[in-house]
UniProtKB/Swiss-Prot annotation:
Stretches for region Disordered: 32-58
Homology family: Belongs to the Su(H) family.
Gene disruption: observed consequences: Leads to cold sensitivity, slow growth, and altered colony morphology.
UniProt GO BP: cell adhesion; positive regulation of transcription by RNA polymerase II; regulation of lipid metabolic process
Chief location of this protein within or outside the cell: cytoplasm
GO molecular function: DNA-binding transcription activator activity, RNA polymerase II-specific; DNA-binding transcription factor activity; DNA-binding transcription factor activity, RNA polymerase II-specific; RNA polymerase II cis-regulatory region sequence-specific DNA binding; RNA polymerase II transcription regulatory region sequence-specific DNA binding; sequence-specific DNA binding
Function text: Transcription factor that behaves as a negative regulator of adhesion. Recognizes specifically the canonical CSL response element GTGA/GGAA. May also play a cbf12-antagonistic role in the regulation of a number of other important processes such as extracellular material production, colony morphogenesis, ploidy maintenance, or meiosis.
GO cellular component: chromatin; cytosol; nucleus
Keywords attached to this entry: Cell adhesion, Cytoplasm, DNA-binding, Nucleus, Transcription, Transcription regulation
Listed name of the protein: Transcription factor cbf11
Location of this chain's protein in the cell: Cytoplasm; Nucleus
Induction record: Expression is fairly constant throughout the growth phases of haploid cells and similar mRNA levels were found in vegetative diploid cells.
InterPro entries hit by this protein: Beta-trefoil_DNA-bd_dom, BTD_sf, CLS_fam, p53-like_TF_DNA-bd_sf, RBP-J/Cbf11/Cbf12_DNA-bd, RBP-J/Cbf11_DNA-bd_sf
């Protein structure tokens, strides 16, 4: 779900109308009065005969009264099912107090007092006659349209300051959009036997927007690792207290979950702390399982774990292979630093010299260049704009710098050497213990290091700077030996973002189904004037909208061995052409049965070309 698309398609004119069914309300009060008048005129009853029995007139009157009440409730439900068939199921689940229909007259007689009607089905029925659920969704989409289009442009740069900002809609009201973002490693190292292989870096979950509209004020997030067969590891729980970000440092993979699986996913469940109710269920993009990185062979082979220019990565430093002494790269006050409790995704850009010899970012988006060892790169934090000095990326083998060949793959152990003389670097300071290198008659090379940050007295919450550290050789022909303090493990980072909103003034219906997402770019089918695309997280009752147009007619063909993934063919005949607009952009939206609107992160561009204009 991390990719964003925009397509240019022809707009199709059409209209969609729906009728409504009106039923006269039964006057139960008049019926009740008539029954009592019949009983009063019968006469000849004593006190004992007034007791209601199974065959007495009083019993029959109560049965008939309850029967009329049940019929009235059923007719009201039938009217709504005719007028709003797509939301009846949701309304019944939202209002559990609706009386269950009975087939037996004796069962009806037990309900002397008719069950109260839910708020949406009162006698006047204002809520759904005057303001249907479809219209509420349409108005909410229209009010949030500018924000929805922005959601389709790209990933928001998240940090602990930005997650608390709530945008305003067209009407000036606070936005109801809520974004759940998960940043996690794109590979997991395989676990053998009973060992615990922790995810590095640990997954981080951001909550952005008016989260109380969907998740309530007090909730927790449970995250677990799920394999291809739906088996999950022991979940790790974190309370959300408005801090914007949750980090799951204890999450690890076991050999049982990873057995016979090629890919894993993270399962995120949000639960209310008030009643332990499931509020949301999300599944991230796939995570590849890799064995221990090979040190020989396939150096010149590009694989799915090869890093390219523009890849998003995380770097961490570990001393003596100890998990407790793992520090992650972060940004603080515009400076690169190390922390044990937080990390920041960084974009690694390949730098190539231009015709004037000046280093320039290789920014071929369509065909990003694979990064080879010995290349010059830079690290960029897009949230703050912080950029490193030019660095030469080199591989480490057996505590020595290896030859400059092969491609940079994830989970490799690397060093980052200054591409310029140390006097020309800008962003980082020189470590105090490295100042002695100037006074010795040895060949000195400068690397990014973590000696100060790995001080044993520093807490995991401490924020300590990354510094330049000198590594020297007594002979220029000698292989450079490096310690753990200047060695880094590089890992690719994947992201999962789900933006949603609830148009109704009520809590959503809990659902354990995956939220829908687009797997492949839509394709326009000119013959049928429709869009076709692959979807994941499909569930029965799903609605599909293009902006304010919806729900649109579509067909779903499930893939083999699954009911949640398949191909959707979406008709466009319900969308009317607007001659005042040369092109019309619509965000692709999903409405799940619980009433939550899910942003599909895909913008469809409709033009007038199919109409000959």
């Amino acid at each position: 779900m991390g990719d964003y698309f925009a397509w240019d398609f022809a707009n199709i004119s059409g209209s969609n109308t729906s009728g409504s069914l009106n039923l006269n309300q039964l006057n139960l009060d008049n019926i009740n009065n008539g029954l009592h008048n019949q009983e009063d005129g019968a006469g000849g009853r004593n006190e004992n005969s007034e007791r209601v029995g199974s065959g007495s007139p009083g019993s029959v009157s109560m049965q008939v009264l309850s029967l009329f009440s049940a019929v009235n409730s059923a007719l009201a439900t039938l009217e709504k099912s005719e007028e709003f068939p797509s939301v009846v199921k949701d309304e019944q689940s939202i209002f559990p107090a609706v009386a269950k229909a009975s087939n037996s007259l004796d069962e009806l007689a037990q309900n002397i007092i008719p069950a109260p009607s839910p708020p949406g089905f009162n006698r006047k029925r204002k809520t759904f006659d005057e303001d249907s659920s479809v219209e509420m969704i349409r108005r909410a989409i229209s009010d949030h349209l500018d924000l929805l289009n922005n959601c389709c442009i790209g990933i928001a740069n998240l940090n602990e300051d930005s997650v608390h900002k709530i945008s305003l809609t067209r009407s000036g009201k606070p936005s109801q959009l809520v974004t759940v973002s998960c940043r996690h490693s794109s590979v997991i190292q395989k676990s053998y036997g009973s060992e615990k292989r922790y995810l590095c870096p640990p997954p981080m979950v951001y909550i952005n927007g008016n989260y109380s509209s969907i998740f309530n004020q007090s909730f927790r997030t449970e995250i677990s690792i799920m394999n291809d067969f739906g088996q999950c590891s022991q979940p790790i729980s974190e309370e959300y207290t408005g801090q914007g970000c949750m980090i799951f440092r204890s999450l690890h993979i076991s050999s049982l979950v990873a057995a016979k699986s090629k890919n894993l996913r993270l399962s995120l469940d949000m639960f209310s702390n008030v009643n332990n109710q499931l509020l949301s269920h999300l599944v991230t993009s796939s995570i590849s399982i890799v064995s221990k990185p090979s040190k020989k062979g396939s150096k010149l082979k590009i694989s799915n774990i090869t890093l390219r220019s523009g890849s998003v990565v995380s770097l961490y430093n570990r001393i003596n292979s100890q998990t407790v002494r793992t520090k992650y790269t972060s940004i603080e006050a515009g400076q690169f630093c190390l922390r044990g409790d937080r990390w920041v995704p960084l974009r690694i850009n390949l730098l190539l010299p231009d015709e004037n010899g000046k280093l320039k970012v290789c920014d071929d988006v369509d065909n990003p260049e694979p990064i080879k060892y010995g290349s010059i790169v830079e690290l960029v934090d897009e949230a703050t704009g912080t950029t490193s000095d030019p660095l030469i990326i080199r591989r480490v083998e057996k505590d020595h710098i290896a030859e400059e060949d092969g491609y940079v793959n994830q989970m490799h152990r690397i060093v980052l050497e200054s591409a310029y003389p140390i006097s020309n670097v800008r962003h980082l300071k020189i470590a105090e213990h490295s100042s002695l290198a100037y006074s010795n008659n040895i060949s000195v090379r400068w690397f990014l290091g973590a000696t100060s940050a790995q001080n044993r007295n520093a807490s995991s919450e401490a924020i300590l700077p990354i510094e330049w550290e000198a590594v020297g050789n007594l002979s220029s022909n000698e292989m450079t030996r490096v310690g753990d303090s200047v060695c880094w493990t590089i890992v690719g980072i994947s992201h999962f973002d789900c933006t949603m909103m609830l148009p109704f003034n009520q809590n959503p219906v809990p659902t354990v189904t995956d939220y829908p997402y687009i797997e492949e770019p839509p394709e326009y089918l000119e013959s049928s004037r429709s869009l076709q695309f692959k979807i994941g997280g499909y569930s029965v009752g799903l609605q599909i909208w293009l902006g304010v147009h919806g729900p649109l007619s579509y067909s779903f063909t499930a893939a083999a061995d699954t009911s949640t993934m398949g191909t959707v063919t979406l008709g466009l005949s319900q969308i009317s052409y607007d001659p005042s607009c040369a092109e019309q952009k619509y965000p692709l939206l999903f409405v799940i049965p619980g009433g939550i609107v899910i942003i599909g992160k895909c913008e469809i561009l409709l033009t007038s070309s199919a109409f000959g204009n």
